[in-house]
Every structure is written in structure tokens, then in C-alpha cells.
Amino acid sequence: MGSRKECAENRKTFEKREPERYREAVPSLLFWYDYNARILPWREDPTPYHVWISEIMLQQTRVEAVRAYYDRFLTELPDVQSVAEASEDRLVKLWEGLGYYSRVRNIAKAAKVLCDKHNGQLPADYALLRELPGIGDYTAGAIASIAFGIPVPAVDGNVLRVFARVTGYRGDIRSDSFKKQVGEQLRQAISAYTEEQNEKSRGKCAEEKTIPGAPVAHPTKVQSAPGRFNQAVMDLGATVCIPNGKPHCEDCPLSHLCAAFGEDLTAEIPAKTEKKARPVEKRTVLVITDGERVLLHRRPAKGLLAGMWEFPGVVGELSPAAAKKAAAGILRRESEEKGLHAKRLPDSRHVFSHVEWEMRGYRIDVPETIAPGAEYSWATPREIREERGVASAFRTYRDLILKGI
């Protein structure tokens, strides 16, 4: 790991072409990873199923948040067949709190495809993996390389940031052209390294066979090199070449190759893009209870929080009188509005990727059990705790119910 001055001099001396930077990055990262890999539960036994579930969970979700969910999911559903046979409510309950629930629904769809077409096994083929519901380029690359040792890249935001800095790229790293460029360069670099190491291993095996009684070499690390490389870039981007704040260039195994480090541009690369402000939506949440049970509403099958259970509500901030009127309408008992009691609950806020909800809550007590419409269902606190997957946007009100408000 050289100084900035040394790196700048190196660039002036021989100005590496980009393919050379990518090729030199492979052995450097593999060596670094062998000593600095993060200890993560899904790396202990990286079967295709384990890699698949972990990679889907890790989409747009922090590593620390995934750990407990991963262990619980595998305990409940240890293989593809068990996922294919699980009910949607059970799957959503296991996913409760992770968000982006379309992910678990796609897992269920993919599991059924795997059972129907692939004997319940993930295929050792990038193109076939790419055809499965919920699996895009990155996830297919991660599964193919980590679980099967196939020399393909897994390109996500971490990878794009790392190689934007290494190559000195000043444009928008989210552009399709840059993603394509990085993906192709990494594919060539990983393939070349893997083939080179396999050639060396084959030559070593041939030499050892000439020695009577010599053991035959088994290049286990060579076979896993593509997966180790992709995980190395993930770890580098998460712990060293970080997105916000100052990257830890002094600890980076690629600093001798890095244009941004050599030219003191790590703060400018990748280029900052202006974030659009999320719209704020005011909502009123109605926790309607008949004494022992709470009324839940099933959201539509498409759209935000598709198919999830929620507490009924309306758009806008309602007064207590308006909240009682809204509850009476939901219960189809408009004429009995005066018999309802509305109690203010704490306000709550939830941030989605594209919108923020600011919620005002009311508890509405009804004097007797009323049969709700088809999209509604009464549930006890135990059922909410153990069986019904209530969207995490309503966690404040869910927790109040479980505490017996």
C-alpha cells in the first residue's frame, strides 16, 4: 500500500490501462479477503439455497438487520421444498419487519419454479438463475459465483463505488453504460484469473502424479475464487471503501491501483447526485377493537405493502369526531357513530424509499363484535404476534396492541 505520491508517480510512469487495473485487483483482493473477511452466518455453509436466501434478504437491507431473520427463516424453512409448501401468511410473518415484502413473495414463486423444473435445486447456470422470479443480474452473479464457483461478477452499488474510485470515473455510477463496463471488465478479469490458477493447478497435479505415493492436489480455493472475489469486493465496500465519510485508504489492498487515492479525489468520486425529496403523506390509523380483538385490513394484492395486514386508516389527519365517523363507515354502521369512543394514540412516522407517512393514531372501541367486509379480519393479540404479518410501518400501533393498551 503505497503513499499518494507513489501512486501518482506510478500513474505517470506507466498509466495502466483499465483491463490491467481490474486484473491486478483480483489477486490483491483475494489475498486481503483471506485475512479480513467478515464472519457472517450465511458464509459458514454457503449452499446454493443458503446463498439465495441471504442475498435476497440483503437487498436494500443492512447486514446486522438480516442476521436474526436469516437464522429464523432457515430454521422454519430449511430447503426449497419447504418454501414452496409454505402459506403466504407464514412467509410474510417470517419476513415481518424486513420490509420490501415482494422479495419473500418472489422467493415463494421461485421455489415453486425450482420444484417444478429443477427438482427443487437451484441450477448451476447464471442464465437459468436469472430467469427465476426476484433474481436479477447481481443476485444471479452472487449465487453463481459463491455457491457454484462460476466466474461471473456480482455488481452492486458497493462494487460500482470501489471501481469508480480505482479507475477515476467521474460520471454517474448508476448509469447503464458504467454498470455494463464494470461488469464486463470484472467478468474478463475473474475468468482470466480462474483459468490461470486452474492451469497452474493442473500442471502441479501432473507433476505430483509422477512421484510415487504423492497426494493429488485439490484446488479448493481456486474453485471458490470467483465467489471469494465477489465477497471481497462486498466487504471492501462495506468496511474500507465506504460511501459516506472518509474511506480508509490506508487499509485498502487496492490503493496502489487506485486513481482516486493517487490524485486525492476520494471525496469527489463517485460523483454526488442530487436526491429528490420524498413527499410526505398525512394519514390517520384506526385501531378498532371489540375488547379482545383488533380489526385488521388486508391491503390490495398490488402496490405499496401489497397483500400485507394493516390497521384500517384513511389519508389525512382526522379529528376525534371524524375518526369515529370513518370507523363507523368501515364497520358499515354509520348510524351508530355516536356509540363509538375515540382515544388518541401516539403519533408515528415511517419512511419508505419513495414516500414518508406521518400518522395520527386513534383507538376506537366498539360495543359489540361486528362482521367486517371481506378484506377485513378480527385478530387477537396472540394471532397478531404469532400468525399475522402486520406491515412494519404500523409497528408503533402493533406494539401497543401487544402490550395491551
Where are these regions (language model features)?
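Catalytic cores of DNA base-excision repair glycosylases
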Residues: 27-247, 257-259
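Intrinsically disordered, low-complexity, charged terminal extensions of DNA damage-control enzymes
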Residues: 1-38, 44, 194-215, 219-221, ...
